[in-house]
Amino acid sequence: MLEVNILDKKWCSIIENPKNFVLGVINASLKELKIDHYKPNISIALADDDLLHQLNLKFREMDKPTNVLSFPYEQLSNECDLGDIAISIDTIKRESHEYYIPILAHIAHMLVHGLLHLLGYDHQKKDEEIIMKNLEREILASLGYNMCAI
């Protein structure tokens, strides 16, 4: 089951129906990765910089907000609790403006990025980063978005 929690009303001023948008991106990503049959449980928090700052400080010891954080729980299996994704509308808006990225494309990118982290992908090493970026590019292309470089 996919659960979307809108924790900041700014999301509704950017996207007409944020829950449907998020569900569409996540479901299409799972399908593109050919793992949609597992039906994992994922919770997505559509939040703001305040929450992402708190989470980033608590879990990563980084005293600043960030665009997306992922909290994996279980490895992928049938109806597993895959984990949580939190995404900040404030950082997304700022980055979209700063890097001239369409905001919906950037939101989709960060959702895909967060999902890949839940699935165990990382970008700490160059070879891992290449694999993760290629997957992001493929998934975003399947959604009709070009990969935006940040």
Swiss-Prot record:
GO CC annotation: cytoplasm
EC id: 3.1.-.-
Entry's cofactor comment: Binds 1 zinc ion.
Residues engaged in binding Zn(2+): H113, H117, H123
Main location: cytoplasm
Keywords assigned: Cytoplasm, Endonuclease, Hydrolase, Metal-binding, Nuclease, Ribosome biogenesis, rRNA processing, Zinc
Entry function: Single strand-specific metallo-endoribonuclease involved in late-stage 70S ribosome quality control and in maturation of the 3' terminus of the 16S rRNA.
Name of the featured protein: Endoribonuclease YbeY
Organism: Wolbachia sp. subsp. Drosophila simulans (strain wRi)
